[in-house]
């Protein structure tokens, strides 16, 4: 068990735990009284945090079965009202949101493989580290309400110039 912002979360050896990026998202995402999608939710720390701290409605989504199970367990344990969907990015998402918070892999494939950071079954980015984030940027337009906001996580292990160019072309 770990704690994130006072929220107790069950985890295991093969699931992602909250990081400094998770902490930063909790601080910068404008979630109060908003309908939010937490895309790439991991074990659910942000979705639960948003739900317990004033979000109007929260949907948590991840492709990895273990993350879906742990998010469900953690939401129940913390009495957080969250809709949980197993989805490869937006594949099983059908609603529009005021805010999308996204933390999918932005680590280039070679680094992900060398470090072993990603459990088996979790999609890894391509050699640029940008392909999944770029897909989110492009597809998010279909899932954001007018004046909606997209928050994405990208690291120095991603082709930031490619990501910025995609943002400029789409937003």
Over which residues does each language-model region extend?
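Class I SAM-dependent transferase core
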Residues: 1-30
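Conserved SAM/SAH cofactor-binding pocket of Class I
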Residues: 20-110
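Class I S-adenosyl-L-methionine-dependent methyltransferase catalytic core
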Residues: 65-83, 115, 137-138, 142, ...
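Short aromatic-enriched loop/helix-cap "lid" or pocket-rim segments at secondary-structure transitions
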Residues: 97, 111-115, 163
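Mobile active-site "lid"/loop adjacent to the S-adenosyl-L-methionine
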Residues: 104-133
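Conserved Class I SAM-dependent methyltransferase catalytic core
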Residues: 130-171
């Amino acid at each position: 068990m770990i704690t994130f912002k006072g929220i107790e979360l069950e985890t295991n050896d093969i699931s992602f735990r909250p990081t400094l990026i998770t902490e930063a998202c909790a601080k910068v995402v404008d979630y109060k009284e908003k309908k939010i999608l937490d895309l790439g939710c991991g074990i659910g720390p942000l979705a639960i945090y948003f739900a317990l701290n004033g979000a109007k409605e929260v949907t948590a989504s991840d492709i990895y079965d273990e993350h879906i199970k742990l998010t469900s367990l953690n939401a129940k344990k913390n009495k957080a009202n969250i809709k949980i969907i197993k989805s490869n990015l937006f594949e099983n998402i059908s609603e529009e949101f005021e805010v999308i918070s996204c933390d999918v892999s932005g680590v280039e494939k070679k680094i992900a493989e060398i470090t072993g950071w990603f459990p088996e079954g979790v999609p890894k980015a391509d050699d640029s580290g940008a392909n999944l984030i770029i897909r989110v940027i492009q597809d998010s337009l279909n899932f954001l309400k007018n004046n909606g906001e997209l928050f994405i996580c990208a690291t120095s292990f991603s082709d930031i110039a490619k990501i910025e160019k995609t943002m400029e072309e789409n937003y």
